[in-house]
């Protein structure tokens, strides 16, 4: 029984020691003291109770202390609880301090909480970044299209990282400047001969205003000749004018056909009236003979004239060439 009691007691002691060292990061506390960072053991226990991993706070604090930065433990913990990346902020502060860039903890924390990569921003401040613009198409006044690409060298502006526009805005503004410069040129040859004209115009516009970057230089990487847009527009206009003229001609033809049909209908109507009038002639003659207004000799003289007229018409029709009506 005594042996079982000793075994049970040893198991309890081992369990207590295991729980003690798992809940209280003694190893981390020793590492901090060895690095010259004085952190009370109760502070580490309090972090556990606040569900803050002590390692995510202590290791960045050790790096900051070794780099000669004065960073307080409670501020690192507050930044972690706010959802920030403590390790990246400390790395950015160390990089800025070594590069001689003025960057406070509050500024770095604000940049990190704004969703920016503060460490990358410090690196871009030290080593400027080159942004390659996509192919930009623009048309000079002579109608020739030019295709240009540019390389924009930028440096991060730490003071404007919070609330400043990003790379997309820089690319869009540079593209706008390229289009404006090419569009204002009287000839595409002017741009081909002096591509630095685009760079000067873009830099003079102050395109980095309101952005998180400072434009150092704009270099035209390539300028190619595209389509003859002016000639293509003239061809399209001529084709459109041709179609309009054809439509108007078709309209006039349709109107002429309609007028011809109307005239034919009018002729037929006149012929009908003529036939109707001719049908009234015998009746009028009979009425004249009945009333004595026309004598018999006058009637026969009229018939002779009518026969003579019919004969002349027959002779004239016979004298016409074959095929002629």
Curated annotation (Swiss-Prot):
Disulfide bonds: none
Compartments it resides in: Cell membrane; Membrane raft
Record's bilayer topology term: Multi-pass membrane protein
InterPro entries listed in its UniProt record: FloA
Transmembrane segments: 4-24, 26-46
Main location, first listed in the record: membrane
Annotated Gene Ontology cellular component terms: membrane raft; plasma membrane
Keyword terms, alphabetized: Cell membrane, Membrane, Transmembrane, Transmembrane helix
NCBIfam families: PRK13665.1 (NF010186)
Subunit structure: Homooligomerizes.
Function: Found in functional membrane microdomains (FMM) that may be equivalent to eukaryotic membrane rafts. FMMs are highly dynamic and increase in number as cells age. Flotillins are thought to be important factors in membrane fluidity.
Family stated for the protein in its record: Belongs to the flotillin-like FloA family.
Name by which UniProt lists this protein: Flotillin-like protein FloA
Species: Thermus thermophilus (strain ATCC 27634 / DSM 579 / HB8)
Protein's gene: floA
């Amino acid at each position: 029984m005594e042996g079982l009691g000793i075994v049970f007691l040893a198991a309890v002691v081992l369990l207590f020691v295991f729980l003690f060292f798992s809940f209280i990061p003694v190893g981390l506390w020793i590492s901090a003291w060895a690095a010259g960072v004085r952190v009370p053991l109760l502070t580490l226990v309090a972090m556990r109770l606040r569900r803050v991993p002590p390692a995510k706070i202590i290791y960045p604090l050790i790096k900051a202390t070794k780099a000669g930065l004065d960073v307080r433990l409670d501020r690192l913990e507050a930044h972690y609880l706010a959802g920030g990346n403590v390790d990246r902020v400390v790395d950015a502060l160390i990089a800025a301090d070594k590069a001689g860039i003025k960057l406070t903890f509050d500024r770095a924390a604000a940049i990190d909480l704004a969703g920016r990569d503060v460490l990358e921003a410090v690196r871009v401040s030290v080593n400027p970044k080159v942004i390659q613009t996509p192919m930009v198409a623009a048309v000079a006044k002579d109608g020739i299209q030019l295709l240009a690409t540019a390389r924009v060298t930028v440096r991060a502006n730490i003071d404007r990282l919070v609330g400043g526009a990003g790379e997309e805005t820089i690319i869009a503004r540079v593209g706008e400047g390229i289009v404006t410069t090419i569009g204002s040129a009287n000839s595409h040859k002017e741009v081909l001969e002096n591509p630095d004209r685009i760079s000067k115009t873009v830099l003079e516009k102050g395109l980095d205003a309101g952005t998180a970057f400072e434009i150092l230089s704009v270099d035209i990487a390539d300028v190619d000749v595209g389509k003859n847009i002016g000639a293509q527009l003239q061809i399209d206009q001529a084709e459109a004018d041709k179609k309009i003229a054809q439509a108007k001609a078709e309209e006039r033809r349709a109107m002429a056909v309609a007028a011809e049909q109307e005239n034919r209908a009018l002729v037929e109507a006149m012929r009908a009236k003529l036939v109707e009038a001719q049908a009234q002639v015998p009746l009028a003659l009979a009425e004249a003979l009945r009333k004595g207004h026309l004598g018999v000799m006058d009637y026969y003289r009229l018939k002779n004239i009518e026969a003579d007229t019919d004969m002349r018409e027959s002779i004239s029709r016979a004298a016409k060439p074959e095929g002629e009506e």
